Amino acid sequence: MTRAGCELLEVGTTNRTRLSDFSKVTDESAMLLKIHPSNFQIQGFTEQVSASELADLGTESGLPTCFDLGSGTIVDLTKFGLPRETTAQEVLSSGIDLITFSADKLLGGIQAGVIAGRKDLIDSIKQNPMKRALRADRITLVILESVLKLYDPPNDLEKNLPILRALTKPMAQLEQCAGQLTNAFPSAFEVKTIKTRAEIGSGAMPGEGIPSLSLRITHPKKDANKILRELRELPIPV
């Protein structure tokens, strides 16, 4: 941003942002940007601008629009029994010019960033001298391509994509894993399996969760900090 000579100006408030807040563009405005709330969710008296509303405003004002999707996904996750997350395709179909999202996390690939959208804007981004320093290397691209091919039909994503395989693991398998871990503790420890809701995290589905299990670990002579330290000092840290 410093190199480009631009300034990021926030609009609206923490819990309420209206289209009228975005509408206060000036001759110096260069882009309209909306950002995924990442790992938090605001409840109660809230208001936000939809992607389609922002896209329409961008068309009216002659400004490009960008939506940072955070984690990002390219499939409807509700098909796998997971909470809904807006897909990259849906945002682009709403008229947004550019989107950014992660290549790892929900997509299930290698750590990298993806920029997609209008070709002329992508071509302009490619001209930035910083691109050579920040672009993905060949190994990253090869791994990302192999992951994206898993999405080609016919596919069996919940079995072939590790992230989906983990998120959709049946409760029976989780119970089996919990039992194996419980049996691995020395007899002095008291280990109980409890039902919980796991947060996906990594900028995805804030406030949502999926049914999961946790282990509650206690010891008559060790407090929580000592147990935690011992777990972290194992050959395979926990």
What is the predicted role of each segment?
Residues 2-150, 186:
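Conserved PLP-enzyme active-site core in the AAT-like
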Residues 79, 103-104, 122, 131-133, ...:
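Generic secondary-structure boundary/loop-capping signal
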Residues 124-125, 134, 155-156, 224-228:
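Extended hydrophobic-aromatic, low-complexity segments
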